[in-house]
Amino acid sequence: MSLWSSVKFAQRYAQLPKVFYRLVTPQPLDNSRWVIWNGELAQGFALPKHADDPQLLSVFSGAEPFSAFKPLAMKYAGHQFGVYNPDLGDGRGLLLGEMQNQQGQWFDIHLKGAGLTPFSRMGDGRAVLRSTIREYLCSEAMAALGIETTRALGMTVSDTPVYREQVEQGACLIRLAQTHIRFGHFEHFFYTEQYDELRLLADNVIEWYMPECTAHDKPYLAMFEQVVARTATMIAQWQAVGFAHGVMNTDNMSILGQTFDYGPFGFLDDYEPGYICNHSDYQGRYAFDQQPRVALWNLSALAHALSPLVERDDLELALAQYEPTLGKVFSQLMRQKLGLLSQQEGDSELFNAMFTLLAENHTDYTRFFRTLSQLDSEGAQTVIDLFIDRDAARGWLSRYLERVALEQTASGEAKSAQQRCEQMRAVNPKYILRNYLAQQAIDKAQQGDFSEVHTLAKLLKNPYDEQAEMEAYAHLPPEWGKKMVISCSS
């Protein structure tokens, strides 16, 4: 039986007019070999669990032409740090084609680091080992956290030198996503006044990903309303888990509200609302607490690009749903994290007091929620000890426990402390991809040892489980590992 006999492939984007993309032959790296293969994900597409067959490597590294693929570089534009840039496109990644999973969903196959394209501008079309490791680990960690995201099927390393601040090893990521269509695709056709192509793009987004919009009397408006709702939900998830993306340009915003293009990202260590993870973000435009505002700005930019298809008043009404949706989803997530099942008056004040307390005491965000979810077994003092101002912590904890008791009285369903805490542990991760953990894996990998990449990948598949033998990975970061800022260079 052929390696590919059970895999279903398609090339829908390649059927669009040539103005949407350029066909490009991948430029394979020298002596490519696997760093890691995501066997569990692969099986969902009828691919083997283990990457033993050499054809897997040669096809997915771009070294061997494959009849089911039609490699292409997408053309798009975008606002970068608020400034429109018309000269964007896939500069080092190629859309190879699509695969269908066992649930019948189609996923793009994208090879990141595949070489020069017509859109490479001053770049070399390559990706380096460190950034590829970070994207592989984080996209899979986010999926395990239940956050909408692209996925990583595998990654390779090579002997090809790549020149950045220093000479580094070239690597490739095999990224899967339900789509690689970005806000910037629509911006490109709008600003170049290619309105027929703009309409065709919207038609295909609806046909491929949002067929329910066709029943709407204004299908393009229905599409935009979905983008608004999905984006608001994604941002609420980011804020709840403490994830900072770092470079929320419109060309990095997925039309399906999926976390896209992992670059200088970071998870909060100490709760610092103004946390900036991208060292190129001098003004803090993409700081953690600015992400909700920036997402709305980006949606407004998309709305402008859709103005030939949708009435302005309709676009404004759709945009007006962003903040209520974000607030509703975020409040739901916060209640889940605190073990509160019902909505009560005063919840916002309780949340705000908690965030103020966390910020003033520089308390670790993930550790706080995980410790709070162990209140049944560890007791209140373990929570209080996380804070410098223990009296303030004691006061907030008293308010919190009163709120828990109020909910039980109001609902008439008194959950035990153990039941509540078990539910909290299912939504408050013990393990996240802290930047220092990723850096330790990168340091080893650059010496040819990929064991830590595999260890983290396995650990982060089950972030809510105790995994007692992995306890060291739940420790607070060392001083050198706190507030790391990451370069966009990759």
UniProtKB/Swiss-Prot annotation:
Name the UniProt record assigns to this protein: Protein nucleotidyltransferase YdiU
Protein family according to the UniProt entry: Belongs to the SELO family.
Species this chain originates from: Vibrio vulnificus (strain YJ016)
Protein EC: 2.7.7.-, 2.7.7.108
MF GO annotations: AMPylase activity; ATP binding; magnesium ion binding
Cofactors: Mg(2+); Mn(2+)
Enzyme class: transferase
UniProt: Mg(2+) binding residues: 252, 261
Residues annotated as the enzyme's active site: 251
Positions contributing to ATP binding: 89, 91-92, 112, 124-125, 175, 182, 261
Pfam families: SelO
